[in-house]
Amino acid sequence: PAATAPGEIVVNGWSPSKRDNPYANSGMVVQIDVPIAANYLKKNKNSLPENHPLLLLAFQKEVEQAAFKVGGGLQVAPAARLIDFCSNKVSTNLPDASYLPGLHSAPLNEVLPHFVHHTLQEGFKAFGKKMKGYYTNDAIVVATESRTSSPVRIPRDADRLHHPQIKNLYPCAEGAGYAGGIVSAAMDGQK
C-alpha cells in the first residue's frame, strides 16, 4: 500500500526488493485533463472551480477514497480479472497476486471515473490484438494506481526555470509536476 492518508487505496510502485516473486506487474495510466476532472468532481458534489490549483489533487483523492470504500477497507484493494473488467463484470474469484494485504473482487466501474474505465478497457483490448496472451482472465486489474505524476504543478519561469516569485527556488522533476518517472526527472534536472 502507498496511501498517505486514512480512507484511501493507492497501489503504486510496490514490488519485492529482490524482484523474485512469481508475479509480473505494470501500471496502466490514463491522461486526466482538467475540464474532465472538474466535471467528475461536480457530479460528486465537489465544486472546486476549474482553475483551482488543487483541482487534480481533489480528483485523485476522490478516486482513491472510492477504491477504499469498494475494497472493503483495511487497505484491501478492489480488483477484477482483465476480461471481466473489460466486460463490466464482477469476477467470481481472483488469482493470487503480489499485492499485500490482498485483493477484493469488486465492480471497478464504480471505482474509476467512466472515462478512465472506458479508456482502459479500450487500451487492454487493443493490446490484446497486438500481443498474444495479453488479454486473458488470468490477468487482473487492481485499483488504483493514481500516483504516477504530481497532480499539482509548481510554476516556474520558462527561460530561467526558477519560481516566478521566489528567487533561487527551482521547481523540477516529479514533485513539482515536471516529470512522471526517474528518467524524465533526470532529464528535467539536466535542463
PLM regions with names:
Residues V34-I36, G175-Y178:
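A generic structural motif
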Residues S184-K191:
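An active-site-proximal "capping" alpha-helix that borders the catalytic cofactor pocket
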